[in-house]
């Protein structure tokens, strides 16, 4: 049985469909990523799976328990790390941990053993009695993760865990999550709009756009599922008539997608296509304004399945706050 089972899960807000009939499963021990822009439905999905928002229709089970009918059982088995950091800035790391442990009814003697061990696990042992307002963003995020583990959950939900962190802190959080998953036998479900994060961390990725599931597989298989081994991104001084047809006839070209004045060309052999492209531009009397060649990435996968780039979707997405407090009642 999967740790997370989702069947035709839907959430509507009036006429707006935030999550549209999603179905998938997350196996025990897996790091499962939900990849998509802000407004794609990722945070709404997390809120339903963690019992904070009821679905309009469909079903979801966490550890075998229904998120609506058996919400209390679900809450005892999950850890939730929201996007917004909620630790009390005036209290110490130890005090923040202690308050959360008390909310879960953890006995005093167990708290005394557990809290130092968790702070050590997230490399905050030396900062245990320092006020959180002295912490960097990465340190605060590590504290939030430790706090989410006080009741020893086996299924861990993280909503955009590295948003707002600098690159060094992001990598530190990645490494810590991988280690904690291994040491504590966790199943992790996280949302992200960072392609590199999904690629590095996740065993499988579900790409979500406009509330719909558009692709699901391992990062390697997703990248292998689209045409070509290389992506050429090229723009020209001008675009002649039928230029797309000319590009499609170049050697080794698998696919051409125009985007304004930029053309994304999927190629089985990037160098050979590049040489032919330069010759075609010369013969047409036009200038190549910019050209880049790279191996296939998850960004290319996103473009292939949705028709637009993730960064474009992020810019056009409506503002939405995914912060929430966890209520055990």
Predicted regions and their residues:
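C-terminal coupling/interaction segments
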Residues: 269-329
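Non-catalytic alpha-helical coupling and interface elements of nucleotide-dependent molecular machines
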Residues: 105, 227, 231, 303, ...
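Residues at or immediately flanking beta-strands
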Residues: 59, 92, 131, 231, ...
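ABC transporter nucleotide-binding domains
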Residues: 2-6, 11-215
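Preference for bulky hydrophobic residues occupying beta-strand positions
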Residues: 11, 24, 233-236, 265, ...
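ABC transporter nucleotide-binding domain
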Residues: 175-268
């Amino acid at each position: 049985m999967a740790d997370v089972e989702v069947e035709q899960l839907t959430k509507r807000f009036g006429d707006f469909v935030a999550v549209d009939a999603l179905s998938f499963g997350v196996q025990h021990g897996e790091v499962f990523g939900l990849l998509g822009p802000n407004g794609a439905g990722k945070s709404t999905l997390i809120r339903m799976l963690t019992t904070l928002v009821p679905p309009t229709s469909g079903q979801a089970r966490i550890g075998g328990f229904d998120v609506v009918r058996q919400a209390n059982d679900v809450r005892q088995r999950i850890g939730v790390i929201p996007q917004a950091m909620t630790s009390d800035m005036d209290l110490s790391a130890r005090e923040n941990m202690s308050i959360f442990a008390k909310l879960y009814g953890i006995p005093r003697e167990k708290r005394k053993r557990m809290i130092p061990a968790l702070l050590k696990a997230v490399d905050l042992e030396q900062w245990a009695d320092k006020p959180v307002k002295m912490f960097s963003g990465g340190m605060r995020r590590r504290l939030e993760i430790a706090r989410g583990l006080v009741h020893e959950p086996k299924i861990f939900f993280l909503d955009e865990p590295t948003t707002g962190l600098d690159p060094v802190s992001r990598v530190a959080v990645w490494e810590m999550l991988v280690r904690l998953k291994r040491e504590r036998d966790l199943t992790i479900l996280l949302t992200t709009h960072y392609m590199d994060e999904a690629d590095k961390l996740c065993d499988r990725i579900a790409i979500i756009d406009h509330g719909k599931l558009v692709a699901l597989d391992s990062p390697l298989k997703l990248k292998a599922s689209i045409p070509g081994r290389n992506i050429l991104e090229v723009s020209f001084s001008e675009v002649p008539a039928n230029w797309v047809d000319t590009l499609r006839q170049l050697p080794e070209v698998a696919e051409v997608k125009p985007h304004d004045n930029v053309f994304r060309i999927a190629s089985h052999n990037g160098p050979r296509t590049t040489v032919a492209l330069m010759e075609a531009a010369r013969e047409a009397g036009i200038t190549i304004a910019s050209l880049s060649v790279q191996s296939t990435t998850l960004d290319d996968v996103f473009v292939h399945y949705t028709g637009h780039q993730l960064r474009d979707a992020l810019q056009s997405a409506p503002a939405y706050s995914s912060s929430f407090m966890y209520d055990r009642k």
